[in-house]
């Protein structure tokens, strides 16, 4: 798989953007993509030193134009991406990631939770297209590389979801 392969898209009128928006700026599906890609990368690569759930098959099923977390996308790119994805397959991916994460968490020892991960594991995320070299994306490697596995459970695995979830719920209930 290759990393981010975005193309510039023409700006949609504001009312068209809002149709796809999870807030006044970001589509709901992007919020889910972003949080679950991060959960997939952190749980599988950093916490378990295993393989991420996301692969070429998921890329095709979801019909995503990117493999990374989407941090470096401009709003126009996010809107264009959101129009093309298969939402049902994104939901299936989210469920697969969540089930897998629960298995990983159930097997962690206290010693592992207190430990840091090797730099090689962190760099795998870039090598496998989970982040791009854009500064808005690559900073995640520095951030995650400074956390213990316990810190990863608290930050990218828990509070990160809670940061994005209210925006999505507000739009659904709104």
Where are these regions (language model features)?
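Short, contiguous alpha-helical
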Residues: 15-72, 102, 119-174
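Acidic/histidine-rich alpha-helical segments that form the ligand environment
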Residues: 66-116, 149-160
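An N-terminal domain-cap segment
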Residues: 1-22
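Short secondary-structure boundary micro-motifs
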Residues: 2-4, 87-88, 138-140, 146
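A generic structural signal for well-ordered alpha-helical segments enriched in polar/charged residues
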Residues: 3, 7, 41, 96-103, ...
């Amino acid at each position: 798989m290759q990393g981010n392969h975005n193309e510039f898209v023409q700006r949609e009128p504001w009312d068209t953007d809002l149709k796809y928006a999870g807030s006044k700026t970001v589509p709901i599906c992007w919020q889910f993509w972003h949080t679950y890609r991060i959960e997939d990368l952190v749980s599988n690569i950093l916490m378990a030193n295993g393989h991420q759930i996301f692969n070429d098959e998921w890329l095709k099923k979801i019909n995503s134009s990117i493999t990374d977390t989407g941090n470096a996308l401009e709003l126009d790119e996010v809107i264009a991406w959101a129009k093309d994805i298969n939402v049902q397959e994104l939901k299936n991916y989210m469920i697969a990631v969540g089930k897998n994460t629960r298995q990983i968490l159930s097997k962690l020892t206290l010693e592992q939770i207190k430990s840091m991960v090797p730099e090689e594991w962190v760099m795998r995320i870039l090598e496998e297209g989970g982040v791009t070299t854009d500064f808005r994306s690559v900073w995640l490697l520095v951030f995650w590389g400074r956390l213990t596995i316990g810190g990863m459970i608290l930050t990218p695995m828990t509070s990160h979801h809670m940061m994005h979830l209210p925006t999505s719920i507000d739009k659904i209930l709104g």
